């Protein structure tokens, strides 16, 4: 029995198929990866967060996009659909169709069991190469927890010596408030998780900080 032959597509072929497909798929290195459906809890958390961002940023020059807008990571050729995107400069798109954003400022992912490893690892490693990106937030759907990575100023005498550092702040508990300083806004976890129910209550709250250097512990390729 012969092994099943993989079919590889060019980015142009992927986009042609994607724009007429009934479901969304991601693209990387010639391969297409169908996206799984989301749980009601995942959808509610993403909706709450989007609504909160839209209201908070209403009078500011920032736009909030849902998971229907693709993002392209130009350095690697990854096409993906973050759960929530914030763009605060004039949007730059991959082509005149204006359905693939190149310059997100903030990317937010609501974690799912099937995507958490990739969102924390390979996908974040690629997101970090987007020059416009300043903030990356991971929102748990299993407990009240928001992990917020913030790009720090590069250090080094030359571009070759510079190291991009990302500061992690973890907000846990419904009485905590996530702060996105680059946007000048606060996101109360009680509003992010409004009407979200868990089998067991999560007690306590805390804020943790740790610095990670670019490239550490992110080796898995996106799937």
Where are these regions (language model features)?
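Gly/Pro/Ser/Thr-rich low-complexity, intrinsically disordered segments predominantly at protein N-termini
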Residues: 1-223
């Amino acid at each position: 029995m012969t092994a099943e032959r993989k079919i590889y597509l060019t980015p142009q072929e992927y986009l042609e198929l994607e724009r007429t497909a009934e479901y969304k798929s991601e693209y990387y290195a010639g391969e297409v990866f169908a996206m799984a459906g989301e749980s009601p809890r995942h959808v509610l958390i993403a909706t709450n967060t989007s609504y909160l961002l839209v209201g908070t940023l209403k009078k500011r020059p920032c736009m909030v996009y849902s998971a229907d807008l693709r993002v392209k990571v130009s350095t690697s050729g990854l096409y993906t659909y973050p759960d929530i995107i914030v763009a605060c400069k004039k949007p730059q798109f991959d082509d005149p169709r204006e359905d693939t954003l190149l310059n997100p400022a903030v990317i937010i992912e609501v974690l799912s069991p099937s995507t958490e490893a990739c969102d924390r690892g390979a996908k974040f490693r690629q997101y970090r190469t987007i020059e416009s990106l300043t903030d990356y937030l991971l929102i748990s759907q299993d407990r009240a927890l928001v992990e917020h990575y913030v790009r720090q100023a590069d250090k080094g005498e030359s571009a070759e010596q510079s190291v991009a550092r990302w500061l992690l702040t973890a907000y846990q508990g419904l009485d905590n408030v996530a702060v996105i300083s680059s946007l000048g806004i606060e996101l109360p976890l009680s509003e992010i998780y409004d009407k979200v129910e868990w089998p067991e209550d999560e007690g306590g709250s805390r804020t943790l900080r740790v610095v990670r250097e670019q490239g550490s512990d992110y080796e898995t390729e996106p799937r």
